[in-house]
Amino acid sequence: MLVDDEESIQLLYREEFEDEGYIVDSAYNGSEALAKFRENPPDLVVLDINMPGMNGIEVLRQMKELQANLPVILSSAYQEYKQDFGSWASEAYVVKSANMDELKATVRKYLG
């Protein structure tokens, strides 16, 4: 599942991951992501941190309460968040749009 409020990021990530053979579900905000998560839990989540309403850290916390072993990759345009990601119980942190190969390699690490 891809959770990001920016349409351009949604389109880029969706195209890249579908080209890799993944089925991509997406949500534009935390509430939508949690509703979809409860209906059909994904195998992995790529999650933006800065979103209107519920931020990515709160979404991460709620998803982990429901499924502790869910791999979550935090994604943000802000490099400074990278130093904090370990305290947020995510599996990885990738700077948004900086390196698509890094994000794809991280996803492959968890999904094969």
Model feature map: region roles:
Residues M51:
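Receiver (REC) domain active-site loop signature in two-component systems and cognate sites
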Residues E58, Y78-K96, M100-A105:
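Alpha4 helix (beta4-alpha4-beta5 surface) of REC/receiver domains from two-component response regulators
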Residues I73-S75:
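Hydrophobic/aromatic residues positioned on beta-strands within the core alpha/beta folds
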Residues L11-D19:
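Charged docking surfaces used in two-component/phosphorelay signaling
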Residues D48:
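Active-site residues of response regulator receiver
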Residues G21-Y28, K36:
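Short hydrophobic/Thr-rich beta-strand motif most characteristic of the beta2 strand and flanking loop
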Residues N29-E32, N55-E58:
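Acidic catalytic/metal-coordinating carboxylates
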